[in-house]
A protein has these predicted regions:
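Short amphipathic alpha-helix adjacent to the substrate-entry channel of hydrolases
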Residues: 79-99
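Primarily recognizes the serine-hydrolase "nucleophile elbow" in alpha/beta-hydrolase
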Residues: 127-208
Length: 299
C-alpha cells in the first residue's frame, strides 16, 4: 500500500511539473537555418542563419529580405530566439536571417571616455546588414527592400545600426549602406543611460523620415518608458509611421512564449502585407485562448 501511494504521489507531482512546462508548440525547437559567416570580430567568426522560401530560386526571384537581431542584454542571447519567426516569414515568401553578433564586454578594446561597450554590437549589426545586401544576388533578395528588427537589446541594435552613420567596421564595403525600408521591433530596449554615449543613444539619431515600424510592448514592461521617450521625439518631428501594439498585462520579452509569439507574428505579417512586402493572409491561426494586441492611441 505504501509503495502504491508513493507511485501515485510521484505521478501527481509529474503531472504538475508537466503542466508548468511550455506547450509542445512552444518548447519544440525550430531547426537552424543555413549558416553563413559574415565577418570576423573579437577573434571569432560571426554567423547568421538564413531561412529561404519553399522552392526559392535566387536566379529568378528577388524577394524582400528580413534580418533580425536577438536580445539578451547586449551580453547574451542566442539565434534560437528568432528561428521560429524566420522560418514562418520564409514560409510566407521572404528570405529571413537571424544574426549572431559580438557581445559587449568590459575588457573590450579601448573606447573613448564615456564610450559604451554596446558599440561593438552595433558595429557587427551594421556588418551583417551590409553582408546581406552585398550577397543579395546569390540569396535571391532585393537589396532595396530590406527589413530589420529584433527583440529587446536586438531592437536597440537594429535601430542604431540603421540610423547612426558611425560605428562602421573599416573592413566593411564602403559603397553599401545600412538603410532599410521597415522595422519589426519586439520591445526594443532604449536605456536612459545610453545618453552618456551619443553613438548608441537612439535619441541622438532620430529623424522624421522613419520607415514604417511595428512595435510590440507589454503594458507592464519596465523598458516601455525608454520607448515612450523615443516615440514622443519621433512624433515631435512629425513622424507618422509607427504602429505601436500593446499586450495587456504582459512584461518584458512576452513575445518569446506562446500564445503571444503567434499573436505578434500574425500582427507583423499583416503589417508587412499592408506595406507591400507580403501578399495574402497570415497562415498562422490565432490562439483559441483569445489573446489580442491593443493598438495604442496616438499621443
Amino acid at each position: 500500500m505504501k509503495k502504491l501511494l508513493t507511485i501515485l504521489f510521484c505521478a501527481i507531482c509529474g503531472a504538475s511539473i508537466a503542466a508548468e512546462k511550455p506547450g509542445a508548440d512552444e518548447s519544440a525547437k525550430t531547426p537552424p537555418g543555413k549558416s553563413y559567416t559574415y565577418k570576423q570580430s573579437g577573434g571569432k567568426p560571426r554567423e547568421l542563419e538564413i531561412y529561404f522560401p519553399p522552392n526559392h530560386d535566387p536566379a529568378k526571384s528577388k524577394v524582400p529580405g528580413v534580418i533580425l537581431f536577438h536580445g539578451g542584454g547586449w551580453s547574451g542571447g542566442t539565434l534560437d530566439q528568432f528561428r521560429a519567426a524566420c522560418a514562418y516569414f520564409a514560409s510566407r515568401g521572404l528570405v529571413c536571417a537571424t544574426v549572431e553578433y559580438r557581445m559587449m564586454n568590459k575588457n573590450d578594446a579601448k573606447l573613448p571616455e564615456g564610450g559604451s561597450n554596446k558599440r561593438v554590437c552595433v558595429t557587427d549589426a551594421k556588418s551583417a546588414i551590409r553582408w546581406f545586401k552585398q550577397h543579395a544576388g546569390e540569396l535571391g533578395i532585393d537589396p532595396a527592400r530590406i527589413i530589420t528588427g529584433g527583440g529587446s537589446a536586438g531592437g536597440h541594435i537594429s535601430a542604431l545600426a540603421t540610423m547612426n552613420p558611425g560605428l562602421n567596421d573599416p573592413a566593411d564595403p564602403k559603397d553599401i549602406d545600412t538603410r532599410v525600408v521597415a522595422y519589426l521591433w519586439f520591445n526594443p530596449a532604449f536605456a536612459p543611460a545610453d545618453n552618456k554615449d551619443p553613438e548608441i543613444d537612439i535619441l541622438t539619431h532620430q529623424k522624421a523620415d522613419l520607415p514604417p515600424a511595428i512595435v510590440f510592448f507589454g503594458d507592464q514592461d519596465k523598458w516601455k518608458d525608454g520607448w515612450d521617450k523615443a516615440q514622443a521625439k519621433w512624433e515631435s518631428l512629425g513622424t507618422k509611421t509607427i504602429d505601436l501594439q500593446i499586450a495587456p498585462g504582459q512584461t518584458h520579452s512576452f513575445f518569446n512564449k506562446e500564445p503571444w509569439r503567434t499573436v505578434t507574428l500574425i500582427a507583423a505579417d499583416k503589417f508587412l502585407v499592408k506595406h507591400g512586402f507580403l501578399t495574402g493572409e497570415p497562415t498562422l491561426k490565432a490562439p483559441a485562448t483569445g489573446e489580442k494586441l491593443v493598438p495604442a492611441s496616438p499621443k
